[in-house]
């Protein structure tokens, strides 16, 4: 389901030669496939609205010979991609997925290897509750350059659940998107002419939210301040959601809508490896989360994001973050591509997104609360350890930050922290080893209440 065309022509005859060969993504990799590259352009040929599903054509192409495929991307990509570079070419993005689970309870998956699949390797939705993975691995066969990808989308994706999940001793690698995405689908809607009708304020409409009669909704204003309203769905008519009571006053462009029957929470991730993959390590849009003794490395866009948000074009995800701990983990060479947000390249990110993803705008009421990072080790940073905004009660303590490595870049703030907005933020008792360029904390004036940066120290190696 995938291919690599490189200067050495690994294929004498490509398996799809003479057949239709859709091209969805081109991701630059090191020649030895040890990790993605961030110094040359990548390309995604999907549509934000049509997606990148199986059977959707993305890019015109034609066969030149049994092992040469000519593609017709936009001119800029063709001009900027260096000759002789190694790219991982994928024919699919979303697809059938490897293992799909919906509304199971008390389920264990153990000693499973998913070598490759179209779409998410593992996909969870519905009222799934009380389940665990023990030694479940998403990784292609070792030492086979022709098997250059595991999952063509996320390694593990939770679209909705009722929580209580364990991920123990697992390894996720070489997929084409996030290692783990834990959230519940939300919805961005607005008042219609009828006060009991909710209309879409997002171009994707109700599809991913999948509302059903009888479900109860809880509404928030578009800055995540409470609307103090709950009501039930009476019926669905096209894109219209009919409710059992009038909607409250709409103070902005719409309402962020949660389904009360879902709540992805109580997650334990322990002794796992998240390495050598596209996109991010873990996206946590959940409550009551423990991430312990895990290893993150050689990641394209950063290791962990605590977030919740909505956009006006694409996705609306998460019911907020509360009570999360990241302890005893090792982070090495994360955010290879130098992905920046809110003006800084970073590894860890805590932020909401509103209307666009990412966004500088942050909620009036912090939606990310009570997060602790302690006793972790960071090596070979591209930029900051973390950016923090839209958050309340966040602590980074007793962590080690080490200089040096090959991640690249000479950013003046490498190794430090940026607090862009929030309340009760503590960066305390951390150790900066070696010649860390910036052993400090950046604070956005007027946007932070009660920042404590104390007890941090530099140690010569």
Regions inferred by a protein language model and the residue ranges of each:
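Extracellular beta-helix/beta-solenoid repeat scaffolds
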Residues: 1-10, 130-141, 153, 182, ...
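Extended hydrophobic/aromatic segments used for targeting, binding, or gating
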Residues: 126-173, 178, 311-327
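Short glycine/acidic-rich loop motifs that flank beta-strands on beta-rich extracellular proteins
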Residues: 96-98, 118-124, 141-154, 163, ...
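Extracellular beta-strand-rich solenoid/capping regions of secreted or surface-exposed proteins
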Residues: 1-12, 93-104, 119-127, 155-161, ...
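Extracellular beta-strand solenoid repeats
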Residues: 100, 108, 113, 123-124, ...
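Extracellular polysaccharide-degrading/modifying enzymes targeting complex plant/algal/animal polysaccharides
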Residues: 1-116, 124-125, 140-149, 173-265
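Leucine-rich solenoid repeat scaffolds
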Residues: 418-461
């Amino acid at each position: 389901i995938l291919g690599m065309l490189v200067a050495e022509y690994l294929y004498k005859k490509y398996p799809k030669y003479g057949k239709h060969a859709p091209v969805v993504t081109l991701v630059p990799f090191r020649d030895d496939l040890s990790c993605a590259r961030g110094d040359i352009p990548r390309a995604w040929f999907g549509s934000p609205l049509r997606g990148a599903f199986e059977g959707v054509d993305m890019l015109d192409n034609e066969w030149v010979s049994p092992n040469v495929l000519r593609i017709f991307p936009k001119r800029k990509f063709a001009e900027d991609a260096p000759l002789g570079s190694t790219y991982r070419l994928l024919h699919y993005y979303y697809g059938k997925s490897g293992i799909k689970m919906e509304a199971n309870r008390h389920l264990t998956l153990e000693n499973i290897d998913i070598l490759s699949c179209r779409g998410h390797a593992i996909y969870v939705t519905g009222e799934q509750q009380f389940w665990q993975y023990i030694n479940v691995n998403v990784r292609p066969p070792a030492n086979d350059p022709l098997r250059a990808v595991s999952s063509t989308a996320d390694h593990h994706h939770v679209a909705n659940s009722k929580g209580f999940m364990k991920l123990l001793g697992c390894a996720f690698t070489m997929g084409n998107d996030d290692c783990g995405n834990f959230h519940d689908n939300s919805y961005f809607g607005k008042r219609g002419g009828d006060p009991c009708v909710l209309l879409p304020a997002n171009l994707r409409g109700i599809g991913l939210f999948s509302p059903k009669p009888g479900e109860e909704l809880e509404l928030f204003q578009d800055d995540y301040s409470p609307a103090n309203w709950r009501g039930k769905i009476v019926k669905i008519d096209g894109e219209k959601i009919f409710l059992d009571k009038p909607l409250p006053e709409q103070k902005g462009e719409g309402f962020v809508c949660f389904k009360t029957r879902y709540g992805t929470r109580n997650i334990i991730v322990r002794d796992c490896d998240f390495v050598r993959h596209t996109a991010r390590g873990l996206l946590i849009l959940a409550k009551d989360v423990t991430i312990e003794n895990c290893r993150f490395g050689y990641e394209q866009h950063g290791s962990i994001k605590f977030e919740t948000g909505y956009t006006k074009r694409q996705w609306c995800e998460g019911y907020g973050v509360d009570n999360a701990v990241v302890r005893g983990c090792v982070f090495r060479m994360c955010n290879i591509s130098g992905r920046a947000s809110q003006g800084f390249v970073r590894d860890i990110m805590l932020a909401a997104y509103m209307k666009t993803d990412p966004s500088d705008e942050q909620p009036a009421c912090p939606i990310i609360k009570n997060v602790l990072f302690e006793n972790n080790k960071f090596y070979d940073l591209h930029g900051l350890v973390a950016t923090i905004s839209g958050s309340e009660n966040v602590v980074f303590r007793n962590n080690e930050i080490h200089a040096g490595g090959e991640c690249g870049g000479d950013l003046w703030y490498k190794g430090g922290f940026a607090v862009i907005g929030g309340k009760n933020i503590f960066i305390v008792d951390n150790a900066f080893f070696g010649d860390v360029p910036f052993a400090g904390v950046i604070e956005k004036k007027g946007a932070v209440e009660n920042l404590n940066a104390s007890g941090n120290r530099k140690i010569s190696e």
